């Protein structure tokens, strides 16, 4: 599973097929960008 938790939201992916590392980094970078 994948959990991304910040001050504004919780993103959870508990599907049996996980996301790639590149997709996870893209999500984190997008969250960081919108926080600026």
From Swiss-Prot:
Asked if the keyword S-adenosyl-L-methionine belongs to this entry, the reply reads no
- A Gene Ontology molecular-function term? thioredoxin peroxidase activity
Catalysed reaction(s) here are: a hydroperoxide + [thioredoxin]-dithiol = an alcohol + [thioredoxin]-disulfide + H2O
Q: In which tissues is this gene expressed?
A: Venom gland.
Keywords (A to Z) from UniProt: Antioxidant, Oxidoreductase, Peroxidase, Redox-active center, Secreted
**Entry-linked InterPro entries:** Peroxiredoxin (IPR050217), Thioredoxin-like_sf (IPR036249)
Which Gene3D superfamilies does the record associate with it? Glutaredoxin
What are the GO BP annotations of this UniProt entry?
cell redox homeostasis; cellular response to stress; hydrogen peroxide catabolic process; response to oxidative stress
Which Enzyme Commission number(s) are listed?
Answer: 1.11.1.24
Gene Ontology CC terms: cytosol; endoplasmic reticulum; extracellular region
Q: Which domain of life is it from?
A: Eukaryota
Quote the subcellular location field of this record.
Secreted
Note the subunit structure: Homodimer; disulfide-linked, upon oxidation.
Family, per the entry? Belongs to the peroxiredoxin family. AhpC/Prx1 subfamily.
State the function annotated in the UniProt record: Venom peroxiredoxin enzyme that may play a role as part of a redox pathway leading to the structural/functional diversification of toxins through a disulfide bond engineering mechanism.
What else does the entry mention about this protein? The active site is a conserved redox-active cysteine residue, the peroxidatic cysteine (C(P)), which makes the nucleophilic attack on the peroxide substrate. The peroxide oxidizes the C(P)-SH to cysteine sulfenic acid (C(P)-SOH), which then reacts with another cysteine residue, the resolving cysteine (C(R)), to form a disulfide bridge. The disulfide is subsequently reduced by an appropriate electron donor to complete the catalytic cycle. In this typical 2-Cys peroxiredoxin, C(R) is provided by the other dimeric subunit to form an intersubunit disulfide.
* Protein name as annotated: Peroxiredoxin-4
